[in-house]
């Protein structure tokens, strides 16, 4: 007669901690680089900052949402500033190029925060995509 094999563990998964803290605990520790490129993408709803090395490999990224801002507060200039400070402090940059894309309200605040942080900026480039009379824009909102 066959002997029953005892089960180790159960099928139910036990959730440890809260859901909102799960993202921060899963994040890898960022590589520390001295020279890199800071990409600032400022939309009307959010500000996303990506730090890459000179070859273009992503080292760290941060957005207003990951810094703790929700809903319409993500679009504020203060959220853009906090996002920029968070991204630079984590990586420890000394020299950088800045690529700015978009026309959101966090754009200037993020740029000001990067300049004040002590990082030497070699160039600031605006890479906002501009159509050469391409697609028809959406109709204006009527509120």
From Swiss-Prot:
The gene is rps11. GO terms for cellular component: chloroplast; ribonucleoprotein complex; ribosome. NCBIfam families: PRK05309.1. The keyword Lipid biosynthesis does not apply. Pfam families: Ribosomal_S11 (PF00411). Keywords: Chloroplast, Plastid, Ribonucleoprotein, Ribosomal protein, RNA-binding, rRNA-binding. Belongs to the universal ribosomal protein uS11 family. Its main location: plastid. Transmembrane segments: none annotated. One of its GO terms (biological process) is translation. InterPro entries: Ribosomal_uS11, Ribosomal_uS11_CS, Ribosomal_uS11_sf. This is Small ribosomal subunit protein uS11c. It is found in: Plastid, Chloroplast.
